[in-house]
């Protein structure tokens, strides 16, 4: 019997050599995801071309989805090795520089102090670390860690989407989109979609003349506008990491099931993503 459920795998630092990629394809990878939030454009183009080459060498068609960064707020990089934050400890946040440390986290969002309110819960990564904002001190926010963990690299910072003054897709997204449409990408995933208008702003030919557009459902606004988003898209992704930062954890399985059922009713493929190997 043919396998109807397809496997999407992200091509990252551990899998971007030809040998590993070949093994992933032989093991059953149907679609390679290339996340555009990290690395240079040249590096991502090289990954794209490598997937095409290896799949061609194996005589197998492997789809490629490029995942646009979207208006994601990210921390400035930590020192090599990262930091460990323990429950009950205090951390400061601001927008002052290009590096983060064990007691001060810089963020690449200029409106952080205006958009975040006292009492807000902010999560780093996909919920690895959660803090509560307790006070303002000059041009800094002071927050207490309520769920400790490790941070390294440039983790995302989840700010409540109803106050985030950023739209999707961003100008940078549209520039990246042009590059990968020209290269012939099969699919494009759009981050932090809030309405069908965000999908229409891409301005690309719909599949099959252009790439399939995948709307990532990761905000409360997207859930509220779900039917219109599904109708405007070629497929939908349940992005459980950021969606789980906006919804209570016990609500997430019900939201996931609801989104998938709506996709089935409207005849669109549904993708479940984030921490699949840990769940």
Which residues make up each language-model segment?
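Non-catalytic helical/linker scaffolds that mediate oligomerization, partner binding
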Residues: 1-279
């Amino acid at each position: 019997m043919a396998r109807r459920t397809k496997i999407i795998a992200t091509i990252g630092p551990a899998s971007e050599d030809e040998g590993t990629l070949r093994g992933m394809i032989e093991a059953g990878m149907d679609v390679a995801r290339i996340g555009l939030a990290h690395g240079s454009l040249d590096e991502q183009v090289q990954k794209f071309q490598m997937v095409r080459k290896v799949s061609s060498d194996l005589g197998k068609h492997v789809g490629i989805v490029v995942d646009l960064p979207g208006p994601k707020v990210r921390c400035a990089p930590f020192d090599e090795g990262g930091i460990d934050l323990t429950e009950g400890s205090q951390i400061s946040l601001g927008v002052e520089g290009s590096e983060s440390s064990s007691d001060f986290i810089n963020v690449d969002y200029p409106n952080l102090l205006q958009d975040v309110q006292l009492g807000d819960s902010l999560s780093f990564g996909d919920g690895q670390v959660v803090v509560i904002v307790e006070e303002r001190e000059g041009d800094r926010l002071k927050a207490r860690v309520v769920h400790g963990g490790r941070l390294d690299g440039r983790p995302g910072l989840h700010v409540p989407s109803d106050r985030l003054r950023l739209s999707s897709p961003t100008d940078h997204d549209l520039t990246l989109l042009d590059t990968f449409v020209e290269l012939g990408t099969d699919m494009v995933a759009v981050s932090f979609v809030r309405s069908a208008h965000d999908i229409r702003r891409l301005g690309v030919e719909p599949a099959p003349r252009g790439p399939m557009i995948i709307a990532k459902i990761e905000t409360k606004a997207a859930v509220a506008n779900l039917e219109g988003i599904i109708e405007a898209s070629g497929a939908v992704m349940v992005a459980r990491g950021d969606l789980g930062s906006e919804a209570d954890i016990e609500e997430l399985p019900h939201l996931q099931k609801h989104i998938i059922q709506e996709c089935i009713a409207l005849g669109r493929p549904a993708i479940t993503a984030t921490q699949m190997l840990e769940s």
